[in-house]
């Protein structure tokens, strides 16, 4: 388990990245709505260009940081990764939200490219522009759900957690397994993000 100072640092990092992610998504949603509904051509163009930069330089880094620091928090504190239902549910929400975010960066780039090429009329790229609003709303609800789980911590302990509560001393193999899980998750995520940045980053589509 992590020491007190390390645990507080990890918690601070996790909360900061999670709050930053939520705030960036809220800003993204405001820009998406403005870009969809405004008739001011310069404003629409600026909104979609800003959305692409917010995505790659704020939302993506904060989402990855939130997921990784969440794993560190789970594996390095008594909460554990599989001991409480709320931890598992929050992890699932975060993983799904991060994966969907990375997959749906292509429409953002497509609309930003369209804005660069010239003024966007009301009907131009409308399906993609509507998708950006819908994606942002879904992401906002997912992050609010994750925040709610962190605050209320519902549903109690899993069967695995109850067994560990009775016999809290971990076997060496259990320690090796949890550390291996963390390293594998980190490696897979880093490789996926690196591949996506290379193949579908800013104007890479």
Where are the model-predicted features located?
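Polytopic transmembrane helical bundles with strong interfacial aromatic enrichment
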Residues: 1-205
């Amino acid at each position: 388990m992590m020491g007190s100072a390390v645990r507080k640092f990890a918690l601070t990092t996790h909360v900061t990245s999670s709050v930053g992610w939520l705030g960036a998504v809220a800003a993204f949603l405001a820009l998406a709505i403005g870009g969809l509904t405004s008739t001011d051509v310069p404003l629409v163009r600026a909104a979609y260009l800003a959305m692409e930069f917010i995505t790659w330089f704020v939302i993506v880094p904060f989402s990855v940081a939130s997921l990784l620091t969440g794993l560190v928090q789970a594996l390095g504190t008594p909460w554990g990764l599989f001991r409480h239902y709320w931890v598992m549910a929050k992890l699932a929400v975060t993983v799904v939200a991060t994966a969907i975010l990375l997959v749906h960066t292509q429409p953002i780039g497509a609309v930003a490219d369209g804005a660069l090429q010239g003024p966007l009329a009301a009907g131009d790229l409308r399906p993609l522009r509507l998708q950006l609003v819908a994606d942002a709303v879904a992401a906002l609800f997912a992050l609010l759900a994750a925040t709610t789980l962190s605050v209320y911590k519902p549903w109690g302990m899993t069967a695995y957690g109850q067994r560990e509560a009775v016999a809290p001393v971990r076997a060496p193999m259990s320690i090796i397994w949890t550390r291996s899980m963390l390293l594998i998750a980190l490696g897979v995520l880093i490789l996926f993000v690196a591949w996506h940045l290379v193949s579908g980053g800013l104007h890479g589509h």
